[in-house]
Design a protein with these regions (language model features):
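Extreme N-terminus nucleophile/cap motif
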Residues: 1-70, 201, 236-238, 244-259
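Conserved beta-strand-loop-short alpha-helix elements that form
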Residues: 2, 116-126
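Fold-independent oxyanion-binding glycine-rich loops
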Residues: 10, 93-96, 121, 196, ...
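Short acidic (Asp/Glu) patches
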Residues: 31-33, 68-84, 88, 92-114, ...
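Cytosolic regulatory regions built on CNB/CRP/Popeye-like sensor folds
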Residues: 59-62, 68-69, 126-138
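Catalytic core of PPM/PP2C metal-dependent serine/threonine phosphatase domains
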Residues: 89, 166-203
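Long, charge-dense
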Residues: 135-161
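A conserved acidic, glycine/proline-rich C-terminal tail/linker
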Residues: 207-238
Length: 259
């Protein structure tokens, strides 16, 4: 299992979202409140991806990623980077590796390509045999160049394949969740995706909360604090969030409910 978050809004330091909140990802790495399906800590690596600030009118820069196989609380270099780095969008995660899967930096989220950043909180049941069918839709080169031999890396490859084909981001996540659930029933499939302007996420087997106001959107496995405005996402729902807009839709439906 893992914990993850994504933010889009006014530029803030990474530290203010990841390290400093009373229940930020740093605390969730060693004292999570709502781990489901096994695991007690998230100490098998972590990562963060952020979108560098660019001058007004300039095209947006692709995100920068920092990934490690160490627990977040042991990495003084990341703490320094997070305190000195300001971004208007980011995705970060802490990892609890499924038994038998490698603990390496390349196995830690976020995964990415171009403008996209992606994370998975959960597990694919019966890995790897159960998902041979969905994996067969990928080009062989995609399978040979997975970031790591893990379920999360394969899920990213499946989502990325749909995005490359022109799928709308929410539809790409929905299609992958439903295909993998059919092939591997009982999987836990909380997926998180951003392009730096909006956030898409699924709640499928694990907790997920959102906080959206006119200025910012924040999606997190667990609320970062006890402040007002947090909303728990119902099980088996798709989230589309951007500043000033939150949409929820059942993952078996294509009709969103705008909040």
């Amino acid at each position: 299992m893992c914990r993850h978050l994504a933010y889009v809004g006014p530029p803030v330091t990474m530290s203010s979202l990841v390290l400093e909140p009373p229940h930020g990802l740093l605390r969730q790495s060693y004292a999570p409140r709502d781990m489901r399906g096994g695991g007690t800590v998230n100490a098998d690596g972590f990562g963060a991806g952020w979108y560098p600030a660019v001058p007004v009118g300039s095209p947006g820069a692709d995100p920068v990623r920092y990934r490690s196989a160490s627990p977040m609380w042991t990495d003084a270099a990341f703490a320094a980077v997070a305190g000195a780095t300001t971004a208007g969008a980011l995705l970060a995660a802490v990892r609890s590796a499924t038994v038998g899967m490698p603990v390496t930096a390349s196995a830690s989220a976020p995964f990415g390509e171009g403008r996209w950043l992606f994370s998975h909180n959960g597990v694919v049941r019966g890995w790897p045999a159960a998902v041979a069918g969905p994996a067969a839709e990928l080009p062989v080169t995609d399978l040979l160049t997975l970031d790591a031999p893990t379920d999360s890396a394969l899920l990213w490859a499946l989502v990325r394949h749909r995005l490359r084909a022109g799928a709308e981001p929410g539809a790409a996540l929905t299609g992958v969740v439903l295909a993998v659930e059919q092939a591997a029933p009982g999987s836990r499939l909380n997926l998180l995706l951003t392009d730096g302007a909006a956030i898409w996420a699924t709640a499928w087997g694990h907790a997920l909360s959102v906080r959206v106001d006119a200025a910012a959107a924040l999606v997190s496995s667990e609320p970062l604090d006890d402040g007002i405005g947090w909303e728990e996402v119902p099980h088996r729902h798709l989230v589309t969030a951007r500043p000033g807009q939150l949409r929820l839709a059942p993952l078996t439906s294509t009709t969103p409910q705008t909040r």
